[in-house]
Amino acid sequence: MGKRDRADRDKKKSRKRHYEDEEDDEEDAPGNDPQEAVPSAAGKQVDESGTKVDEYGAKDYRLQMPLKDDHTSRPLWVAPDGHIFLEAFSPVYKYAQDFLVAIAEPVCRPTHVHEYKLTAYSLYAAVSVGLQTSDITEYLRKLSKTGVPDGIMQFIKLCTVSYGKVKLVLKHNRYFVESCHPDVIQHLLQDPVIRECRLRNSEGEATELITETFTSKSAISKTAESSGGPSTSRVTDPQGKSDIPMDLFDFYEQMDKDEEEEEETQTVSFEVKQEMIEELQKRCIHLEYPLLAEYDFRNDSVNPDINIDLKPTAVLRPYQEKSLRKMFGNGRARSGVIVLPCGAGKSLVGVTAACTVRKRCLVLGNSAVSVEQWKAQFKMWSTIDDSQICRFTSDAKDKPIGCSVAISTYSMLGHTTKRSWEAERVMEWLKTQEWGLMILDEVHTIPAKMFRRVLTIVQAHCKLGLTATLVREDDKIVDLNFLIGPKLYEANWMELQNNGYIAKVQCAEVWCPMSPEFYREYVAIKTKKRILLYTMNPNKFRACQFLIKFHERRNDKIIVFADNVFALKEYAIRLNKPYIYGPTSQGERMQILQNFKHNPKINTIFISKVGDTSFDLPEANVLIQISSHGGSRRQEAQRLGRVLRAKKGMVAEEYNAFFYSLVSQDTQEMAYSTKRQRFLVDQGYSFKVITKLAGMEEEDLAFSTKEEQQQLLQKVLAATDLDAEEEVVAGEFGSRSSQASRRFGTMSSMSGADDTVYMEYHSSRSKAPSKHVHPLFKRFRK
């Protein structure tokens, strides 16, 4: 019996990923196993057996990685565990980086040495943009300072041998299974299920195999600026050519030619039944030949072209152009994800993609504010008429007659309860349309099951995901690879900053000592009120007030972020500054934001977590964070993005934007702060620790006396546990707000004077260890 219990527990642990998702409250629908949509090779890892580890945990690769004679001229170290290290000071860094971004996931990219990791998904992405198995292995051998380990070669072959060899192409509204490898087509046709999916003529005979030769050329033309190589990469030193081995030099020249030349490709294809597409995809995955979806939009004569083009004023930056060339590399549209920093112009990439495809386009954002901003971006960068844009939110439901671009939110499409009559009509219209392109903004925020629902409601030939932070605190991010497509491009934040495309930001963590009275209560209290105590720390308030005064004297525009509404109101009201949070009406929000943008007297605004992703404030150049959402790396990066937009007319200084995170010393907040910074540190940012703000004693600041601090403490202690809760943003997925909380009250409250009831808790009973707890509920016991 004990063995069976142990086996059950092991099985539950292996499935834990599908249950424990912090950002998804929905129950698993029967038959929706995510593993059905993932080839078995995707779960493979690089074999590390045989690697020696010293007493400090460092790996000793000296025997496995003998150096080449000309190793100083080659930029890569390829470790047996799949990690690749790139010397950013190498004269051939430009080419090596472009290659690594295509085949591996960036792990950490500081100034001098960058770290990447080979994964099954990154290799799938490499194959999807046209790289062959032999290309990847040959390039790695040429670039590596040492011999490439056999385990790495086997891993690359395992992950790329079958992926990308078969494509599902839509031409003239007919579906074809296409491949450059005739033997693969013959292998698939031997399977009875695939033979059943093949289209038959009126006599019941299978249609003939179609052999075609076509010339593939990118749908995005190369500009003069980017034709000499991406400006976001370092230029090769002409003096350094003599240091480059001849095989590398010849190879780089060939790479440049291959990118510029048109390529002739011979393909073999057969037509399949449209109603059996889903069954065909599942069967191909089972046979380890997952179908890569491509949309031949130029030859789609069934769906009408829409009247949309880029305005002459819309000039693409080199990295934007490069990301789109990955999407439209062979004259067709590939589905996938493009990762660009906040403020680097993701919207222009989306608008350009819509102008290239020129078919009906559906844009999905995560809030009503982002819907309005997408509409403004389409009008700013493209020639589309206002009447052709249709919004579908709870507040704005434009009539879809003659609509070419529809903009909505994930929650509107994924809504399962009863809708109004008007909303039902718009939903019916959305379902019946055949969309050429679907743009998914902030694609990392929505869990896999929500995507499945949205993707089954509307049909689109091509899906483009846009995000700045391809990270989640759970491991659901990998599901995007097969729900949308592989990662097509990821920009290097530091290079964009050095080239002036995004602001140069000074990141600082300001340590604020806890006042003795506040710290005494912090140690004694075990409830959520501890959060209020370290957020309302008087020394943190004084530091915030000092930084606001300092930057206002420089005529800077300042945003102060607070996840806690109690703290947000206290800070803003005491400092006499406007604030925006969930219940603030749309009209008041727009009024505050317009004043912040154009009124020289309004230089500081306070915003709750509603401003993390939806507010576009290019004027802001200082951000102060007084409270945050635990250790969320994503939120830290999104907030930094509020001040990342390139600054116009700023004084030429080393830094032109500032990001301050105020942290109460010796509290849980310090551990959270370290976790939050991991993503930005991996992008190459460094956080300066400030323990004392120079000139703070000379300023006239609030809470300078013990009496004032004591009054503030009493106010915090009188607050309820509900006040310590973070704000729950309407329409936010996975928000779990507790329906009840334990709090102190007066005797009149307990007798029903303010609609509360008296309850008792048995602490010993709640602390009793529970047996055989299902993994789904374990996190509630933490």
Curated annotation (Swiss-Prot):
Regulation: Phosphorylation on Ser-751 by CK2 controls the 5'-excision activity of ERCC1-XPF endonuclease; phosphorylated protein inhibits the excision activity and thus NER. ATPase activity is stimulated by TFIIH subunit p52 (GTF2H4). DNA translocase activity by this subunit in TFIIH is stimulated by XPA, ERCC5/XPG and XFP plus ERCC1; translocase activity is sensitive to triptolide which targets this enzyme.
BP term (GO), one: transcription initiation at RNA polymerase II promoter
Alphabetized Gene3D superfamilies for the sequence: P-loop containing nucleotide triphosphate hydrolases
Outcome when changing residue 346 to R: Dominant-negative effect on transcription and NER, induces chromatin collapse, probably has no ATPase activity. No transcriptional activity of the reconstituted TFIIH complex. TFHHI is inactive in DNA repair and in transcription
Predominant localisation class: nucleus
UniProt catalytic activity: Couples ATP hydrolysis with the unwinding of duplex DNA by translocating in the 3'-5' direction; ATP + H2O = ADP + phosphate + H(+)
One cellular component term from this protein's GO annotations in UniProt: transcription factor TFIIH core complex
Domain Helicase C-terminal: 542-702
Key words of the record: ATP-binding, Cockayne syndrome, Deafness, Disease variant, DNA damage, DNA repair, DNA-binding, Dwarfism, Helicase, Host-virus interaction, Hydrolase, Ichthyosis, Isomerase, Nucleotide-binding, Nucleus, Phosphoprotein, Transcription, Transcription regulation, Xeroderma pigmentosum
Compositional bias segments (type: Polar residues): 218-236
Pfam families listed in its UniProt record: ERCC3_RAD25_C, Helicase_C_3, ResIII
Keyword Transferase attributed: no
Compositional bias ranges of the Acidic residues kind: 21-30
Methyltransferase listed as a keyword: no
Modified residues (Phosphoserine): 686, 751
Residues of the Helicase ATP-binding domain: 327-488
Family: Belongs to the helicase family. RAD25/XPB subfamily.
Assembly notes: Component of the 7-subunit TFIIH core complex composed of XPB/ERCC3, XPD/ERCC2, GTF2H1, GTF2H2, GTF2H3, GTF2H4 and GTF2H5, which is active in NER. The core complex associates with the 3-subunit CDK-activating kinase (CAK) module composed of CCNH/cyclin H, CDK7 and MNAT1 to form the 10-subunit holoenzyme (holo-TFIIH) active in transcription. Interacts with PUF60. Interacts with ATF7IP. Interacts with KAT2A; leading to KAT2A recruitment to promoters and acetylation of histones. (Microbial infection) Interacts with Epstein-Barr virus EBNA2.
Function per UniProt: ATP-dependent 3'-5' DNA helicase/translocase. Binds dsDNA rather than ssDNA, unzipping it in a translocase rather than classical helicase activity. Component of the general transcription and DNA repair factor IIH (TFIIH) core complex. When complexed to CDK-activating kinase (CAK), involved in RNA transcription by RNA polymerase II. The ATPase activity of XPB/ERCC3, but not its helicase activity, is required for DNA opening; it may wrap around the damaged DNA wedging it open, causing localized melting that allows XPD/ERCC2 helicase to anchor.
Disease: Xeroderma pigmentosum complementation group B: An autosomal recessive pigmentary skin disorder characterized by solar hypersensitivity of the skin, high predisposition for developing cancers on areas exposed to sunlight and, in some cases, neurological abnormalities. The skin develops marked freckling and other pigmentation abnormalities. Some XP-B patients present features of Cockayne syndrome, including cachectic dwarfism, pigmentary retinopathy, ataxia, decreased nerve conduction velocities. Trichothiodystrophy 2, photosensitive: A form of trichothiodystrophy, an autosomal recessive disease characterized by sulfur-deficient brittle hair and multisystem variable abnormalities. The spectrum of clinical features varies from mild disease with only hair involvement to severe disease with cutaneous, neurologic and profound developmental defects. Ichthyosis, intellectual and developmental disabilities, decreased fertility, abnormal characteristics at birth, ocular abnormalities, short stature, and infections are common manifestations.
Extra remark beyond the main annotation: The TFIIH core complex from patient XP11BE (a patient with XP/CS who has a C-terminal splice-site frameshift from residue 741 in this protein) reconstitutes in vitro transcription about 30% less well than wild-type but does not restore NER in vitro or in vivo. The XP11BE TFIIH complex has all the subunits in the same stoichiometry as wild-type. Purified mutant protein has very weak 3'-5' helicase and ATPase activities. In another paper the mutant protein has wild-type 3'-5' helicase activity. The mutation is recessive to wild-type.
Record's protein name: General transcription and DNA repair factor IIH helicase/translocase subunit XPB
Species of provenance: Homo sapiens (Human)
Gene: ERCC3
